[in-house]
């Protein structure tokens, strides 16, 4: 008996050794346990039960083999009409739960092109039969199919009170801990985009909570980028976690993934500096080539986020310059706008933009030309072929300017004023009372910005076009509003004001924060007599003010000085050249009879003591007067 038992166990162990390599770890442990139990079992244990126990892991292994596609699966995928799918229910095919779910998913896809047919589908008897079949076997639907199924039911417009929809939602809740991270993300996107019902929003909140808790499960860059694009914007805590994960995996990103992350950040206006720095490093250091689409999107994202990285900007400009012959007019306009937002003036690239416009003068559309013109004005760029370029601009605008959106008309004329290319007819078009009245008293930020540009256009006509006969903005419109001085005080502004107060000694010897009728605010204004002494500025006539306070004429030989501080954002990136807007401001103030005392941030930062700052301003004033006398 003992010998027979040992022989039997030897056979069992040999069988186990042969099956072990193909088994999962759990199966091997189970088999080892069975063998151990065989050796230690009593003689009364029925040996006949052992083969069944040993075969159990083998059966599980067979169950985990890849799914073999059946004919009905092929029919579902190839169906082009809803009727073909519904006929599968009444035919010889015996659909299981997964196939029923696949039919619903395919129906949703087909009806996305014909949304008017959804109502008829929901009333179809076969459709209700399909829902009942699915509802009865929902627990056996695969995870991936379940994640797509819920979105399809939302897209088909299944009523929220439907027990089938509620059953699927409840099944999702039960399986949340088992679902893969990408399935959770897909479900969250479906709840957010395809349904606005209260019950789906509650499910969305649960899904986002799970996504926030399980963010460490993300192991590859593709999943990470997909989740960031699809559901990152739905939850601030989730987005913070995804950005942390992005920093961890960014070295594995390819050009297209870097592009997607940047576009996503730009779309959400998320200026994540650590992530942008990491992406910039890899854009500069890695040898991969960037396609035209990637270059355009990267330039747009950096411009939209106002993130300045010199090496990235240089690479973008260089690579795009080499691709100029292949760019369309729309891409040139898009690219020019991006670099204008980025405040990066690459002279060869912008000359190429101007040449592209001239080469395609007959084909370029007005919107594209407008984008290029506005970009040139922002950066104060004057092309070498200036006459030809602006002749084309005036030719295109001549008949079409009145038909454009009013705010765009103002933007274009303002841009021409910045570049000193505006014509009298164009000034008259936007300064006409019937036109500008729509912007008077505007409450929105856009209307206020547009009216501010109208003030600048009005100042251009008044100061730079001596033969201009009108119309002009009314006196009531050019009077500075309460918001003209309602701005956050910068550190440079505060220090400059304190130094000026100490320099003047008395409040009547100068004015701080002077709002002019030209739409510009002076940091300070002083009046010097012929000996260089301060005069009480408020006692004298000031034509630059909408409501002058003084009545006396300035004495002969007196000089009116305006102090203008220039902050870091007022300049082109990595340059000491002012942006077009501030070039226009300086030009207007000079034309109004002022001597300019420029106070740029890069000079002020070098001054450490109050004495140095006071001496700096005195020296600037003397130089301004000396330059005027030298003329």
Swiss-Prot record:
Q: What keywords tag this UniProt record?
A: Mitochondrion, Phosphoprotein, Transit peptide
Q: Name one Pfam family in it.
A: RAP
Q: Which SMART domains match?
A: RAP (SM00952)
- Summary of the tissues where the protein is detected: Ubiquitously expressed. Expression detected in spleen, thymus, testis, ovary, colon, heart, smooth muscle, kidney, brain, lung, liver and white adipose tissue with highest expression in smooth muscle.
Chief subcellular site?
mitochondrion
What information about domains appears in the record's comments?
Answer: RAP domain is required for TBRG4 function in mRNA stability and translation.
UniProt lists the family membership as follows: Belongs to the FAST kinase family.
Q: What this chain does, per the record?
A: Plays a role in processing of mitochondrial RNA precursors and in stabilization of a subset of mature mitochondrial RNA species, such as MT-CO1, MT-CO2, MT-CYB, MT-CO3, MT-ND3, MT-ND5 and MT-ATP8/6. May play a role in cell cycle progression.
Protein name listed in UniProt: FAST kinase domain-containing protein 4
Which species is this UniProt entry from? Homo sapiens (Human)
């Amino acid at each position: 008996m003992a010998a027979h038992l040992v022989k039997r166990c030897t056979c069992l162990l040999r069988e186990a050794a042969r099956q072990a390599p193909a088994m999962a770890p759990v199966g091997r442990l189970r088999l080892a346990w069975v063998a151990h139990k065989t050796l230690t079992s009593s003689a009364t244990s029925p040996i006949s039960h052992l083969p069944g126990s040993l075969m159990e892991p083998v059966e599980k292994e067979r169950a985990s083999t890849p799914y073999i596609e059946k004919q009905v699966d092929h029919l579902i995928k190839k169906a082009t009409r809803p009727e073909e799918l519904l006929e599968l229910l009444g035919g010889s095919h015996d659909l299981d739960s997964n196939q029923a779910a696949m039919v619903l998913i395919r129906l949703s896809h087909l009806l996305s092109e014909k949304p008017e047919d959804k109502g008829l589908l929901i009333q179809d008897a076969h459709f209700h039969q399909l829902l009942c079949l699915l509802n009865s076997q929902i627990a056996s639907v695969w995870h991936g199919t379940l994640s797509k199924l819920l979105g399809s039911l939302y897209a088909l417009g299944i009523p929220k009170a439907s027990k089938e929809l509620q059953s699927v939602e409840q099944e999702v809740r039960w399986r949340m801990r088992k679902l893969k991270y990408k399935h959770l993300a897909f479900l969250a996107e479906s709840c957010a985009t395809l349904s606005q019902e209260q019950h789906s929003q509650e499910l969305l909140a649960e899904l986002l909570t799970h996504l926030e808790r399980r963010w460490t499960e993300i192991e590859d860059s593709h999943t990470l980028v997909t989740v960031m694009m699809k559901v990152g914007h739905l939850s601030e805590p989730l987005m913070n976690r995804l950005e942390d994960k992005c920093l961890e995996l960014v070295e594995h990103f390819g050009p297209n993934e870097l592009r997607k992350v940047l576009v996503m950040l730009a779309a959400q206006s998320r200026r994540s500096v650590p992530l942008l720095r990491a992406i910039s490093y890899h854009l500069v250091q890695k040898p991969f080539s960037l396609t035209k689409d990637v270059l355009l999107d990267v330039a747009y994202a950096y411009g939209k986020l106002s993130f300045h990285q010199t090496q990235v900007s240089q690479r973008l400009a260089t690579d795009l310059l080499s691709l100029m012959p292949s760019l369309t007019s729309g891409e040139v306009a898009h690219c020019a706008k991006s670099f204008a937002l980025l405040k990066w003036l690459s002279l060869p690239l912008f000359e190429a933009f101007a040449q592209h416009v001239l080469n395609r003068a007959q084909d370029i559309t007005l919107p594209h030309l407008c984008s290029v013109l506005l970009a040139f004005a922002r950066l104060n760029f004057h092309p070498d072929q200036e006459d030809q370029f602006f002749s084309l601009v005036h030719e295109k605008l001549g008949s079409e300017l009145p038909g454009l959106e009013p705010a765009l008309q103002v933007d274009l004329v303002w841009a021409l004023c910045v570049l000193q290319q505006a014509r009298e007819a164009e000034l008259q078009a936007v300064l006409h009372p019937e036109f500008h009245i729509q912007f008077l008293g505007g409450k929105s930020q856009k209307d206020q910005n547009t009216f501010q540009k109208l003030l600048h256009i009005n100042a251009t006509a008044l100061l730079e076009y001596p033969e201009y006969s009108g119309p002009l903005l009314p006196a009531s419109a050019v009077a500075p509003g309460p918001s003209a001085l309602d701005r956050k005080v910068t550190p440079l502004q505060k220090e400059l004001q304190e130094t000026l107060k100490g320099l003047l000694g008395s409040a009547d010897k100068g004015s701080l924060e002077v709002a002019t009728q030209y739409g510009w605010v002076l940091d300070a204004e002083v009046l010097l007599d012929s000996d260089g002494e301060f005069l009480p500025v408020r006692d004298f006539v000031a034509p630059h003010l909408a409501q002058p306070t003084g009545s006396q004429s300035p004495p002969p030989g007196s000089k009116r000085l305006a102090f203008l501080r220039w902050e870091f954002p007022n300049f082109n990136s990595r340059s000491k050249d002012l942006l077009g807007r501030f070039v226009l401001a300086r030009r207007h103030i000079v034309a109004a009879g002022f001597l300019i005392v420029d106070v740029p941030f890069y000079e002020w930062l070098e001054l450490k003591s109050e004495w140095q700052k006071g001496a700096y301003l005195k020296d600037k004033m003397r130089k301004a007067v000396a330059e005027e006398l030298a003329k």
